[in-house]
Amino acid sequence: MLAHLSHSEGHCYRTRVDRFVSEELPEFEPDDAQMYLELYRNANAEDAFDHFAEQRESNVKHLRTLPRSAGERRARHPEAGEITLQQMLHEWAMHDLGHIRQIAELVRARKHLQAAGKLGDSYRLNP
């Protein structure tokens, strides 16, 4: 999951932000995470997290340089139709928060569930 977040940070979202800003109504290709599974399979989690953190810092700095009006820039999305940069930024946050929830569930399952013994029986995991 960390490799996916790292890859999405640089090769999907940042690329799209740049296209929103530099092109007039760019057309985006569908993003298919399945086609990158091999790339993620053997990734080192610490390296992926470090790469993600570096890219996130760079992306936040870049986003802060954009004028507020950039949020109204438009693009064409293959499934959603015409979208604004502002909408994509909200989707980016939802994407990341969804994966953070999954990571938290995996930590809960692997580190705490068994150690809780019978007290853990009433918990349902949703990774």
Each language-model region and where it sits:
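Short, contiguous alpha-helical
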Residues: 1-31, 60, 74-127
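Acidic/histidine-rich alpha-helical segments that form the ligand environment
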Residues: 34-73, 87-92, 100-102
